[in-house]
């Protein structure tokens, strides 16, 4: 069909090369080629903007320091003034496994440096740059702080982090929630067969460690994909020409769908991935107790998954005869366009 030529005849990348440096959790370079001429800039710019603005992350939103009423203060025995301390607090890198606001506390007596690693965290919170210096204490000086940590996206100025019922002494902090710290891309010419006029896109992504560069790029691509879907006003003609279905299976073919297509939260999706749960059929055979024993998997994730499964007429703890089939990967591909 002519309509399909609009996208089927365009070249798609057949190579995706990922190169990591000394710290693969923070820096990676991804090369995609070949691309149609002009698509390198189109995709590179879109991915860069989404990476920097739209990924969820955690950050400190406010701090309370004993004996301090506002940020234009000084603390006896502390070399930095409160303004400098707040600037340092802004750069604390945090990984949070919960969407709910959390509190962290710090208490230390001098002399010596006060670092992010001195902060007492709860189980759902992890400090990713513990060597970050917050302030310096003289001999005999003491400091106590309480931090509020929340999740969000992009940059939120301090004034928007001040609650209406803020107590005296609460200092709101500018929050940079994005786990992505730097993105750059370049477009070069590459060849496809005898055609020397194709694009090669090279993207370098740096994160604070809360998410790997590869995952960050994948999340950004998914965001763009979801945003563009609303503009597609037709069904894929290929579905109309699909081959007849294979013989009837002893279970619901929808169980061959992969769990990463369920649009779960990042935390829930990562927990399933870490537990090697690939297909919906794998998931629904798990009991609630088994799921709650999964590392970093809490009640909120459980309720989210139960709600998604209920919408499909499924639930946890189901017994599925004939699961998993021996040729599960082949079956999943054959039923992909139908379910």
UniProtKB/Swiss-Prot annotation:
EC number from the UniProt entry: 2.7.7.6
Reactions it catalyzes: RNA(n) + a ribonucleoside 5'-triphosphate = RNA(n+1) + diphosphate
SMART domains the record matches: RPOLD
Pfam family, one: RNA_pol_A_CTD
Annotated GO MF terms: DNA binding; DNA-directed RNA polymerase activity; protein dimerization activity
Enzyme's top EC category: transferase
Keyword terms: DNA-directed RNA polymerase, Nucleotidyltransferase, Transcription, Transferase
Cellular-component GO terms for this entry: cytoplasm; DNA-directed RNA polymerase complex
Membrane-spanning residues: none
Domain free text: The N-terminal domain is essential for RNAP assembly and basal transcription, whereas the C-terminal domain is involved in interaction with transcriptional regulators and with upstream promoter elements.
Subunit structure: Homodimer. The RNAP catalytic core consists of 2 alpha, 1 beta, 1 beta' and 1 omega subunit. When a sigma factor is associated with the core the holoenzyme is formed, which can initiate transcription.
Protein name: DNA-directed RNA polymerase subunit alpha
Native organism: Methylobacterium radiotolerans (strain ATCC 27329 / DSM 1819 / JCM 2831 / NBRC 15690 / NCIMB 10815 / 0-1)
Gene: rpoA
